[in-house]
């Protein structure tokens, strides 16, 4: 979890908390938030949460950077796991209210991602289609 702890954040506010879900009873509760069969098979989950009250807010438009900071640390976790040969998936299409209730989270703590982690069942990895570099980069 050091990879997450050391991730950069706006003005170094570090507005994140992480819940490592390992127990079968808690995994069953978490699975109700995102009822996909493949999701229930992971041995461990990390729920990435942010505290919107302490996150930095841009003074020009008051934009809260909690989600951005949480996204940065989520990707740090995914990259570190891949380096160790582990598979991950960034899940953000889950029932947030149910997740908050099942994990007994305070009102100011928002779960933004659930990362199932485990060793891939298959060595074959199907790459998703990616845009060509000239479709996403412009030089001025």
Language-model region placement:
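Residue-level "edge-of-site" marker
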Residues: 17, 94-96, 113
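Helix-adjacent hinge/juxtasegments
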Residues: 35-70
């Amino acid at each position: 979890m050091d990879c997450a702890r050391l991730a950069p954040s706006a003005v170094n506010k570090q507005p994140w908390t992480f819940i490592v879900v390992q127990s079968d009873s808690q995994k069953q509760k978490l699975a109700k938030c995102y009822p996909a069969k493949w999701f229930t098979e992971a041995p461990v989950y990390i729920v990435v949460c942010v505290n919107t009250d302490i996150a930095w807010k841009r003074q020009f438009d008051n934009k809260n950077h909690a989600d951005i900071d949480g996204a940065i640390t989520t990707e740090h976790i995914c990259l570190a796991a891949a380096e160790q040969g582990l598979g991950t998936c960034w899940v953000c299409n889950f029932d947030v209210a149910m997740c908050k209730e099942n994990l007994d989270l305070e009102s100011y703590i928002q779960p933004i991602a659930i990362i199932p982690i485990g060793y891939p069942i298959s060595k074959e990895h199907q790459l998703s289609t990616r845009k060509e570099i000239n479709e996403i980069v412009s030089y001025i």
